[in-house]
Amino acid sequence: MFELARENAPCVLFIDEIDALGASRSDMKQSSGRHLINQFLQELDGINNSNEGILILGATNTPWNLDPAFRRPGRFDRIVFVPPPDEMGREAILRLKLKDKPVEAIDYRSIAKKAEHFSGADIDALIDIAIELKLEASFADGLPKPINTNDLVTALKKHKPSTQEWFITAKNFAMFANDAGLYDDILTYMKIKK
């Protein structure tokens, strides 16, 4: 991966779920995992090759599980909190996701407002539930039916935002394991004072 990035520099190397690769070595029972992390850190540091012209970004839902060595200067030394989409963002996601679906009379703004704290994945789930409802109705009388606002409102009653559980965990880390201020943005978003 690093070799390919170096061959194509300048480039951005984005690693999703970086915690799967950069979990705390002290939590690992097998040495193979520690060796993998050590190798990754050497590549990240450009020990044997230059990483000039490569911007390396990582994403995780659990930054508190990253090995502290990953957060040293020159590595993944900045944590940027990306909150769930706001109302306008949710409306835009709804419009985008429903663009090629059979719909009629959707009040996107109303649904976006009611879908507070929904992530993009939650909005996908919401739409899937609405589609399932329409499929069931279509099987009953054999006629295809477009998705409407009521279908999405019904789907909202069946799906809760997945971010709620994450915020409970994040709040605990931000309140009680935040000496360096890495999670202050989470507290600000949640309107909690330290």
Question: What spans do the regions from the language model cover?
Answer:
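C-terminal engagement/docking regions of AAA+ P-loop ATPases
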Residues: 57, 113-125, 135-194
